[in-house]
């Protein structure tokens, strides 16, 4: 056995031992509702990272089954192309297990678990199988999240111990979303129809093409950007460049400077997500995103959908594209027959953890 193999084996064994020790440790009785993640490392309890497979491992199953028997806040960390979420089993209540303020603390990458948001699996309503709610890393609540809904589907399969292909009806703030777990482990999601009417997005920019806001002028930071606005249940402002700079090289952008100026622009009364796009070919796009309430992230599923819609409306791309994001590629198709957008991409569990509350 090589030294590298031996080290890896020892690491896995240590992780399993840590998980077993945690499972045997009784959770302290709560005195009042307060997350003990910030500023108190001795009170924080985390499980060592472990790999997750389907069917789920015995260690993963044991951890998930502890939910009903202990008074600790259990979670599973998931990621989709680097867009990461703290997933919580909230099927027993329509009230989230943590407040927006507590969610922001959990998402803190220095004093908390670290994530782009907290997602709750809640009871379904209006004929849906489940309800999905999200708190962003700043505590705000978005209507939907494309990468998050893929993680949501994989988390449900883990909770219900489901194998093979499955689809679910998910109630979200953006309406009914239907993800399908495929045989290769990827999740294909029917994201519904894009909303193009300016007031419904919402944006105060005037319509330029029928009722749609396509290649409208938007003054930001001394430049006139040409933007197309799309809602995927949440607002998106898509730009391929300024009037002065027709071809955008997205890697050259400093998102931390320009992103907030789009997000909080007066033309977007509900704020906006912003996608900066580079056209590689008519079926291949590259984007970077500044997300409303989360900032620069490695991926945004609804953003990738909005980008393809905008590219089609501007005559830059076909209806089926690969969209490269910093975290990896997504397959996006805007079908002409039903006007629905379909997104396909990965989602996987990263680790399991607990926080006393």
Curated annotation (Swiss-Prot):
GO molecular function: diaminopimelate epimerase activity
Positions of disulphide bridges: none
Pfam family name, one: DAP_epimerase
Top-level class of the enzyme under EC nomenclature: isomerase
Localization (cell): Plastid, Chloroplast
EC number: 5.1.1.7
Active site per the UniProt annotation: 145, 300
Alphabetical GO biological process terms: lysine biosynthetic process via diaminopimelate
Metabolic or biological pathway: Amino-acid biosynthesis; L-lysine biosynthesis via DAP pathway; DL-2,6-diaminopimelate from LL-2,6-diaminopimelate: step 1/1
GO CC terms, sorted: chloroplast; cytosol
Reactions performed catalytically: (2S,6S)-2,6-diaminopimelate = meso-2,6-diaminopimelate
Signal sequence coordinates: none
Transit peptide, UniProt annotation: 1-47
Keywords of the record: Amino-acid biosynthesis, Chloroplast, Isomerase, Lysine biosynthesis, Plastid, Transit peptide
Family, as annotated: Belongs to the diaminopimelate epimerase family.
Official protein name in the record: Putative diaminopimelate epimerase, chloroplastic
Organism listed in the record: Oryza sativa subsp. indica (Rice)
Source taxonomy: Eukaryota, Viridiplantae, Streptophyta, Embryophyta, Tracheophyta
């Amino acid at each position: 056995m090589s030294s590298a193999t031996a080290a890896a084996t020892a690491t896995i064994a240590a992780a399993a031992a840590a998980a077993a020790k945690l499972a045997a440790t009784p959770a302290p009785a709560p005195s009042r509702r307060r997350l003990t993640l910030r500023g108190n490392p001795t009170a924080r309890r985390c499980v060592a990272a472990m790999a997750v497979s389907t069917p789920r491992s015995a260690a993963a199953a044991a951890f998930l089954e502890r939910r009903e028997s202990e008074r600790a806040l259990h979670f599973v960390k998931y990621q989709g192309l680097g867009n990461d979420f703290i997933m919580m089993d909230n099927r027993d209540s329509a009230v989230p297990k943590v407040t927006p303020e507590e969610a922001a603390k959990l998402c803190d990458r220095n004093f908390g678990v670290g994530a782009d948001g907290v997602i709750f699996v809640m009871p379904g309503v209006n004929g849906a199988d489940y309800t999905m709610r999200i708190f962003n890393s700043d505590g705000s609540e978005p209507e939907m999240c494309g990468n998050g809904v893929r993680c949501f589907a994989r988390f449900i399969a883990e909770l219900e111990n489901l194998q093979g292909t499955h689809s679910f009806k998910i109630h979200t703030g953006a309406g009914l979303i239907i993800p399908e777990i495929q045989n290769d482990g990827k999740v294909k999601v029917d994201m519904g129809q894009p909303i193009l009417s300016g007031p419904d997005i919402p944006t105060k920019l005037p319509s330029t093409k029928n009722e749609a806001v396509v290649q409208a002028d938007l003054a930001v930071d001394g430049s006139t950007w040409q933007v197309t606005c799309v809602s995927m249940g949440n607002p998106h402002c898509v730009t391929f460049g300024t009037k002065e700079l027709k071809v955008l090289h997205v890697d050259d952008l400093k998102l931390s400077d320009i992103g907030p100026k789009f997000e909080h622009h007066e033309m977007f009364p509900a704020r906006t997500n912003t996608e900066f796009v580079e056209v590689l070919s008519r079926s291949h796009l590259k984007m970077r995103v500044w997300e409303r309430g989360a900032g620069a992230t490695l991926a945004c599923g609804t953003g990738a959908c909005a980008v393809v819609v905008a590219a089609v409306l501007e005559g830059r791309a076909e209806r089926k594209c690969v969209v490269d994001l910093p975290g990896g590629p997504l397959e996006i198709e805007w079908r002409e027959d039903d006007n629905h957008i379909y997104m396909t991409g990965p989602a996987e569990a990263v680790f399991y953890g607990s926080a006393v509350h």
